[in-house]
Amino acid sequence: KLAAVAVATLLAAGFGVTTAGSASAATSPSQLCGGYSTSEPMLSQDDSGDAVKALQCELYNSLAYMGPDVDGYFGPKTLAAVQKFQTCTGLKPDGIVGPLTWAKLDYQSSQGTTPVWC
């Protein structure tokens, strides 16, 4: 009985298991990626912070879960993922995340489209 009360308490507090739902066109990338950041600044290798976490999350989702870890540091793995995403979506693979890369990532994330394969 005590275990049942503990489980009920955890579920009521929001620690229950959630199921994955499909993203709708109204779902923003920041909602899909835990709300790390809503700003989309120019990013490049060695940057860090919440905007990098948002980038990493969108890359992770857009590259069929083969993107970088979401750690907030734009290191070699993030650079490689950015360049792969840019190549796959027809952008110059310069590793710099600017307005065009953000726009492609946002579209990919917000539409709930199939991950990029190339």
From Swiss-Prot:
One Pfam family hit: PG_binding_1
InterPro entries noted in UniProt: Peptidoglycan-bd-like, PGBD-like_sf, PGBDSf
Database matches in SUPFAM superfamilies: PGBD-like
Official protein name in the record: Uncharacterized protein in bpoA1 3'region
Originating organism: Kitasatospora aureofaciens
Organism lineage: Bacteria, Bacillati, Actinomycetota, Actinomycetes, Kitasatosporales
